Amino acid sequence: MPVKLDALESCGGASFYAFADYAPLGSDPWMSRTELPSVAAADGVLRLRFQQSLRADQGRDLRFVPRPEAALLARVAERLKGMITDAARHTTFAKSDAYARLRELLAGYEEARRRAVSLGAFNAIASARLFRRLGFSLPFVSLSDLLARDELLPSIASTLAVFIREHALVVEAVSEAMAYDERGELHFTRKESGHVPLAIAGAEDGIRRPLRLVMQGGDHLLVAGGETFNAGPADAASLIDLLQRLSGRWSLDIFAPLFLFRLGVSGIVNGRGSIRYSLVLGHVMRRLFGERHVPNLLCSCAPRPSGPLIDAVCHARGGLPPALRDYERTLIDRFLTNDVGTIREEIRVAWRNGAV
């Protein structure tokens, strides 16, 4: 993530970073846990969680997952302190500085806990604070809040209306694009008939479920789980009304970038995984709207496992444990073991040279 921020800032112009604060818990590992090299851990990996129970909250929209309790953050603090103490026994680094940075990190977590109403908000607040500490100055916004702004809803609804009206064409366009993926490298899921690029968090359980289109006479019914929403003619006006009624519960799916492009976003920074989707998104954009995909900047790197924490584990075990062979330094790792100037330089070199 930091390399993308650095690349985005280097581009200049009116750039911003949007937090997808509505993703379902468990859909990506980084939302469920943070992994760090640890001398004391059985496999060399310390796994931190910021929610009480992954099993209980699995699949829930992050806006509906409770914020971390104070007791949970206290356990995180103790584990991080122990990690630093153990590492200092096996390698040379400024332990007192690491403890000071840990106190600063934890102060940010506590502030985020006080201000947040959900895990999604906690992640956004804590991350934005840390990014600011590292000197990143571009705006950080909640994607769900941005897309729900009254002045943007007409464009969102207009684009959604096209997706619904041309739902068969969307399925066809996705299949056409995926026909080029002979080696199965896109990791893009084919879309079924009635696909709508919209998801809804369950009113009772907060589970994020995709909506699908079912026609009933002239009415367009959007169905998810046990809930059905009548979008009427599914024109822009009726969809604005529907989105306003579902405020705080709806979110866009993998086609979200196309909605942003239609709003006027003129470029995007992607990583190794997300840039592959551009083949499909670009084809859908052309078939559906007759427009080209906006410019992409691939910003990614695969650095070797490194840093004081890795050095400590290797020294203690006589080599790199299998669980850490694909480890990429997290921002927490960097922040605890380096000064801000060093971190920014490592980040700058990483995305320009492809590795640190």
Outline where the language-model segments fall.
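N-terminal targeting/trafficking signals and adjacent low-complexity tails
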Residues: 1-3, 7-356
